[in-house]
């Protein structure tokens, strides 16, 4: 009887142990399933975050490239503006100098006109020399219309109508008129002296006096 009781007790203990093992296995299985589920969700979240990070990093890279490009462009524009300002200042100085020379040249034209009785159209200079020369002793006037480069024809005309000194001064004046009108791209200096041209003998009596 005692032996049967012991056997029954051992069987009950084994049954309880088996039940505890099954319960423990179920608990472990549930925890394992939950762990794997959480791990999968975490991996998915990490993957999404990684993709977002890559997109954000690519966007930041593009923005940095854009900023660098704009910075370089802004620097280039500023350098170009500074260069253009310098060119404009140089051209303005050239224009002012040419204008001063032109005014002085026009004064010279008037002086030579009065001295030689030759009156020209300033707007035709320097391409052509157009106007009239008055021969008061002969009571007549002669029109002239010469190409600005025809120095031989001009020399012949002035030699016949006026003194050799006046002829040379008119040729110098015409050459100077071409010299003081450089193009805007010409960086050379114009070194023409107008005052030297009018050094003719104005004390001599012109033909109309």
UniProtKB/Swiss-Prot annotation:
One of its GO terms (biological process) is meiotic metaphase chromosome alignment. Keywords: Cell cycle, Cell division, Centromere, Chromosome, Coiled coil, Kinetochore, Meiosis, Mitosis, Nucleus. Disulfide bonds: none annotated. It is found in: Nucleus; Chromosome, Centromere, Kinetochore. Residues 74-107 form a coiled coil. One of its GO terms (cellular component) is Ndc80 complex. The keyword Cell division applies. Its main location: nucleus. Belongs to the SPC25 family. Acts as a component of the essential kinetochore-associated Ndc80 complex, which is required for chromosome segregation and spindle checkpoint activity during meiosis and mitosis. Required for kinetochore integrity and the organization of stable microtubule binding sites in the outer plate of the kinetochore. Participates in SAC signaling that responds specifically to disruptions in spindle microtubule dynamics. The NDC80 complex synergistically enhances the affinity of the SKA1 complex for microtubules and may allow the NDC80 complex to track depolymerizing microtubules. Component of the Ndc80 complex, which is composed of Ndc80, Nuf2 and Spc25. This is Kinetochore protein Spc25.
